[in-house]
Amino acid sequence: MSKKSGKGKGKNDGDELGAEKEQVLRTKVESLIQRLGHEQERADRAKAAENELRARLFDLDKDFKNEKDRLFSITSDMTRQYKQMQDELLNQVNDLNKTVIEKDEEIKKKDQQIQDMTKDYEYKLKKKDDEIQDLKRKIEEMSAEFAKMLKDTLDKMQERIEMVQWDSDTDPQMMKRLKDMTGLSNN
């Protein structure tokens, strides 16, 4: 009985054991399915987070590109304004330098004119001084000649007076003769 009952029991035990195994396996499968569901949810959440991050990264990249374009535009505009102001200032400096050169040339011309006028004035002044000296010399010569003439005339008059007899002549006649000799009778 022992063999039979052992065999019979073994079959029942094997069925029980198989049912238990099956139950354990079903539990494991259900657990694995649940776990798979959780993992799928986790993967879906990770995928959603990844998509959200990608969208955010795309927006940030778009914002970055917009900001970069805006900064480039501002930089370009500022560079253009700077170059324009630099050109304007350079033109002003060049114009002012031209004006300075022109004014320097005008000053040089005026200085030359002043020098020429000064030389001309000095030349004319020297010429006038020379004329004055010449006229003074002539006046002195004429004065000397006149003095000589007067002296000669006086000497001649004295000679004539001495020659003329004072006794025979009357005073009015003598005056007339003196006037005739000196040429004062016409006055």
From Swiss-Prot:
Protein name: Dynein regulatory complex protein 12
Membrane-spanning residues: none
Region (Disordered): 1-23
This protein's UniProt keywords: Cell projection, Cilium, Coiled coil, Cytoplasm, Cytoskeleton, Flagellum
Compositional bias (Basic and acidic residues): 10-23
Subcellular compartments: Cytoplasm, Cytoskeleton, Flagellum axoneme
Subunit structure: Component of the nexin-dynein regulatory complex (N-DRC).
Source organism of this protein record: Tetrahymena thermophila (strain SB210)
Gene Ontology cellular-component annotations: cytoplasm; cytoskeleton; motile cilium
InterPro entries, per the entry: DRC12-like
Function noted in UniProt: Component of the nexin-dynein regulatory complex (N-DRC), a key regulator of ciliary/flagellar motility which maintains the alignment and integrity of the distal axoneme and regulates microtubule sliding in motile axonemes.
Highest taxon of source: Eukaryota
Family, per entry: Belongs to the DRC12 family.
